[in-house]
């Protein structure tokens, strides 16, 4: 009885890992986000937040890193005025914590995330550089991330490769705690 379910799970993992390779993928030779996120018209807010928190050095020099980058539309849906409040605050610790929750140490391509989920019976957990857990599971063909308070974000563009990292665009802002 156990063998058929194992075969089904392994087959599903194989098929899902193949589907990731069909997604759009970009490669940049520069280091991570500060030069390349701004190239995307839909990542202006996260670039502004990186500059405001002075996290450019971390992103340009550290690595390997995985960044789950919310689109501008995701930030706009996040909260009316909250992003502006965080960007304009003198104390940038809350904004820095929020950004840190979107970064995981290590080079996690979509296929590595899928393999971790296969090993975890459909679920995987990663520790962000902020120190909190970020869970991943599948919903159809999508990798879905879940934060500690239950918010979810889908990876909409996977494996934007950088010299020292990989970026996955997500459709929602995830949070380490309620803001």
Label each residue range with its predicted role:
Residues 1-10:
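Bacterial N-terminal signal peptides that target proteins for export
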Residues 2, 20-179:
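Mature, structured domains of secreted/extracytosolic soluble proteins
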Residues 9-19:
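Bacterial N-terminal signal peptides
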């Amino acid at each position: 009885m156990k063998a058929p379910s194992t075969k089904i799970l392994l087959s599903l993992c194989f098929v899902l890992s193949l589907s990731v390779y069909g997604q759009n993928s970009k490669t940049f030779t520069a280091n991570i986000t500060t030069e390349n996120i701004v190239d995307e018209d839909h990542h202006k807010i996260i670039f502004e937040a990186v500059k405001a928190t002075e996290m450019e050095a971390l992103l340009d020099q550290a690595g390997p890193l995985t960044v789950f980058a919310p689109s501008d539309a995701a930030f706009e849906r996040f909260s009316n005025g909250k992003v502006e409040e965080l960007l304009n605050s003198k104390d940038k610790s809350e904004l820095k914590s929020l950004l840190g929750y979107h970064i995981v140490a290590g080079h996690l391509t979509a296929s590595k995330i899928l393999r971790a989920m296969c090993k975890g019976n459909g679920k995987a957990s990663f520790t962000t550089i902020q120190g909190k857990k970020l869970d991943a599971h599948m919903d159809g063909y999508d990798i879905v991330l879940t934060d500690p308070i239950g918010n979810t974000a889908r990876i909409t563009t996977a494996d934007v490769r950088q010299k020292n990292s990989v970026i996955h665009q997500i459709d929602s802002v995830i949070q380490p705690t309620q803001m």
